[in-house]
Amino acid sequence: MIPAPPFLQATALTCERDGRMLFENLDLQVRTGDMLQVSGPNGSGKTSLLRLLCGLMQPTAGHVLLNGQPAGRQPTAPGLNLLWVGHASALKDLLTPLENLSWLCALHHPADADAIFNALDAVGLAGFEDVPCHTLSAGQQRRVALARLYLPGPPLWLLDEPFTALDRQGIAQLENHLAGHCEKGGMIIMTTHHTLSRLPAGYRDIDLGQWAA
């Protein structure tokens, strides 16, 4: 049987920032059920790689195909094929968690109010739906951003340090949710300094040191 083509494929990917080569000739493929953890020392280009893969940056050389199309040039609505959660929570401080998520869903994947309330409940923010985000703690703001992972959405998640500012309970819950997403056929590429305790069958580590210039 011929295997299905990869959902995401990077070929000979090279990244230069501020006159410094971070990595070059990087190849990777992501298929159903995969979880890729991008590792490497600070400054090795982990966040840059994620941004290249989702089309937020252009590579110095090489190319990225997402669901068969060049990343960042999707013929359909942005965000249809992947969900990006950066290391900053990227919330509008004066809006509430409900308003922030409603706005993000309107841009990418529409969700009704019940689904958003359920997502906030899943991350332990029931009762905080209508509180301005600037009044929330750093951990609570991070959970608002991560609530997007509990809403209907794309199969591929790109996550930059998703465990930042979470307490022990929040970390354990997120680990289980990420592994469950992959076990159900989803895909994840992420950076994290956290040592994962639950690894799906499709887990593998991508050490950027192998492609350092």
Curated annotation (Swiss-Prot):
Statement: the UniProt record of this protein carries the keyword Lyase: no
Pfam short name (any one): ABC_tran
Locations listed in the record: Cell inner membrane
Annotated CDD domains: ABC_CcmA_heme_exporter
Keyword NADP: no
Documented EC number(s): 7.6.2.5
UniProt GO MF annotations: ABC-type heme transporter activity; ATP binding; ATP hydrolysis activity
Membrane topology, from the record: Peripheral membrane protein
Class of the enzyme per the UniProt entry, highest EC level: translocase
Keywords: ATP-binding, Cell inner membrane, Cell membrane, Cytochrome c-type biogenesis, Membrane, Nucleotide-binding, Translocase, Transport
Residue positions binding ATP: 40-47
Transmembrane segments: none
The ABC transporter domain, residue ranges: 8-213
Predominant location: membrane
GO CC annotation: plasma membrane
GO BP, sorted A to Z: cytochrome complex assembly
Catalyzed chemical reaction(s): heme b(in) + ATP + H2O = heme b(out) + ADP + phosphate + H(+)
Xref: NCBIfam families: ccmA, PRK13538.1
Family: Belongs to the ABC transporter superfamily. CcmA exporter (TC 3.A.1.107) family.
Function: Part of the ABC transporter complex CcmAB involved in the biogenesis of c-type cytochromes; once thought to export heme, this seems not to be the case, but its exact role is uncertain. Responsible for energy coupling to the transport system.
Name this protein carries in UniProt: Cytochrome c biogenesis ATP-binding export protein CcmA
Organism: Pseudomonas savastanoi pv. phaseolicola (strain 1448A / Race 6) (Pseudomonas syringae pv. phaseolicola (strain 1448A / Race 6))
